[in-house]
C-alpha cells in the first residue's frame, strides 16, 4: 500500500466534507494487524449543521475485516 491508512481515511473524509470545510477533529481507530493491499475505503456524512459537518470513514480489507475506522468533525468556512 502506497499511503498510510490514516492518510487514506483523511483523504476520503475531506472528499465527503467538501472544499468549503476545514477539519476540526480527526480520530482514527485501528483494527488488528493484517494485509492492507487492495483495501477499500468508504466515507459518509453522519450529520450536518449550518457550521459543522460530522463524517465517518472506514478501510476494509479484501476479506471484509476492518483495518481502520475514523470519525471527523469539519467546520464550514464561508467563501
Feature names for model-found ranges:
Residues 1-79:
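Terminal targeting signals and extreme-terminal segments of soluble enzymes
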Amino acid at each position: 500500500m502506497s499511503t498510510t491508512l490514516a492518510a487514506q481515511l483523511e483523504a476520503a473524509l475531506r472528499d465527503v466534507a467538501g472544499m468549503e470545510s476545514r477539519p476540526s477533529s480527526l480520530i482514527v481507530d485501528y483494527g488488528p494487524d493484517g494485509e492492507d493491499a487492495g483495501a477499500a475505503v468508504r466515507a459518509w456524512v453522519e450529520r450536518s449543521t449550518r457550521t459543522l459537518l460530522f463524517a465517518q470513514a472506514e478501510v476494509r480489507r479484501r476479506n471484509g475485516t476492518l483495518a481502520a475506522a475514523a470519525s471527523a468533525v469539519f467546520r464550514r468556512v464561508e467563501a
